């Protein structure tokens, strides 16, 4: 009831925000505001809502697809939650130069998972692309992937992919700050491809799927496939079923993490959740460890959370000593892999 009352009170602010975003988009559509065109093909992966949609695993999948196709790739991201400002080189395609505190947890994870990929963070994505073009003029990538850039229209893109969370259709009901929409839903018509992410067998996403198809854009369904349970010392868990866990995370949509654990056959006996991108404190880690010890549980978290914690050696060591694990994930596309791959390759033919 409290949240509903707050949403009602915030409706005037949401209406004003929606008008501002609509005007801004109109000015770009009419060419009054200009978008810079990169000489290197650009693929953007973004959201129309705040919160977790499965965007980061999709970026990782796209980079790995290009790499498997023999296409050198670079990532340019805002680096949400980082303590640095301006343009920063996270990875030169050979060395990881910044951790999660200076690059942002999602960006640091993407760089670590794709060690041959150049990764740059920049609030102004145009400056980030221009920096890498100058810095790596002798080995330019064949394609640049923009992470979280659907609303960042100062840079043009050759393929605009938007991810929508199938598990939370209510997220597209209202504009910020009353809801989670970053811009009016009609903005989806600007996308070239829509990914309905995080579908599950029990998710009631038929209505949302129909709404997305009414944009006239291709819609591909995606689900998160749980991977391996990795001990934070780097070793793999022999079997998921033998682990009784305390699941903890500080992400936008923790229910997706819990679903992945259950799908992987991992028993969840207790949970602890923190705010998305919030730095872990010593007291938070001690509370996790204390609860796990009291109940005889193994702490398990997301790969993104572990990258955030690993930047704090003392906290990381505390979790190593109690056998903490993290779960890897990857997206899969039940009926749209070929369409996604076709569009990604068509970008290179421009």
Curated annotation (Swiss-Prot):
One of its GO terms (biological process) is lipopolysaccharide core region biosynthetic process. The keyword Nucleotide-binding applies. Keywords: ATP-binding, Kinase, Lipid A biosynthesis, Lipid biosynthesis, Lipid metabolism, Nucleotide-binding, Transferase. Pathway: Glycolipid biosynthesis; lipid IV(A) biosynthesis; lipid IV(A) from (3R)-3-hydroxytetradecanoyl-[acyl-carrier-protein] and UDP-N-acetyl-alpha-D-glucosamine: step 6/6. Its EC number is 2.7.1.130. InterPro entries: LpxK, P-loop_NTPase. GO terms for cellular component: plasma membrane. Pfam families: LpxK. It catalyses: a lipid A disaccharide + ATP = a lipid IVA + ADP + H(+). It is an enzyme of class 2 (transferase). The keyword Cell inner membrane does not apply. GO terms for molecular function: ATP binding; tetraacyldisaccharide 4'-kinase activity. ATP binds at residues 49-56. Transmembrane segments: none annotated. Belongs to the LpxK family. Transfers the gamma-phosphate of ATP to the 4'-position of a tetraacyldisaccharide 1-phosphate intermediate (termed DS-1-P) to form tetraacyldisaccharide 1,4'-bis-phosphate (lipid IVA). PANTHER family: TETRAACYLDISACCHARIDE 4'-KINASE, TETRAACYLDISACCHARIDE 4'-KINASE, MITOCHONDRIAL-RELATED. This is Tetraacyldisaccharide 4'-kinase. It comes from Chlorobaculum tepidum (strain ATCC 49652 / DSM 12025 / NBRC 103806 / TLS) (Chlorobium tepidum).
């Amino acid at each position: 009831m409290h949240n509903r009352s707050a949403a009602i009170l915030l409706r005037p602010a949401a209406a004003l925000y929606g008008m501002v975003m609509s005007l801004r988009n109109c000015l770009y559509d009419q060419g009054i505001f200009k978008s810079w065109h990169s000489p290197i093909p650009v693929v953007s992966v973004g959201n129309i809502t705040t919160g977790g949609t499965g965007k980061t695993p999709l970026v990782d999948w796209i980079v790995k697809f290009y790499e498997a196709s023999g296409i050198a790739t670079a990532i340019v991201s805002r680096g949400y939650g980082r303590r640095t400002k301006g343009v920063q080189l996270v990875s030169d395609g050979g060395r990881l130069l910044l951790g999660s505190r200076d690059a942002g947890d999602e960006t640091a994870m993407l760089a670590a998972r794709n060690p041959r990929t150049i990764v740059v963070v920049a609030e102004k994505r145009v400056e980030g692309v221009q920096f890498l073009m100058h810095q790596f003029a002798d080995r330019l990538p064949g394609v640049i992937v923009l992470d979280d850039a659907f609303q960042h229209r100062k840079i043009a893109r050759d393929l605009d992919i938007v991810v929508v969370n199938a598990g939370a259709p209510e997220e597209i009901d209202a504009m910020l700050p009353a809801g989670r929409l970053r811009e009016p839903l009609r903005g989806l018509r600007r996308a070239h491809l829509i990914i309905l992410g995080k579908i599950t067998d029990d998710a009631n996403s038929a209505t949302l799927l129909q709404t997305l198809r009414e944009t006239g854009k291709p819609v591909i369904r995606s689900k998160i496939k749980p991977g391996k349970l990795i001990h934070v010392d780097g070793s793999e868990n022999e079997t998921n079923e033998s682990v009784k866990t305390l699941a903890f995370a500080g992400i936008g949509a923790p229910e997706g993490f819990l679903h992945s654990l259950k799908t992987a056959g991992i028993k969840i006996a207790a949970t602890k959740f923190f705010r998305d991108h919030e730095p872990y404190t010593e007291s938070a880690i001690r509370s996790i460890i204390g609860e796990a010890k009291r109940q005889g549980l193994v702490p398990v978290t997301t790969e993104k959370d572990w990258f955030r914690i690993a930047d704090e050696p003392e906290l990381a060591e505390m979790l190593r000593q109690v056998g903490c694990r993290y779960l890897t994930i990857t997206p899969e596309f039940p009926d749209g892999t070929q369409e996604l791959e076709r569009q990604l390759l068509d970008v290179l033919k421009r």
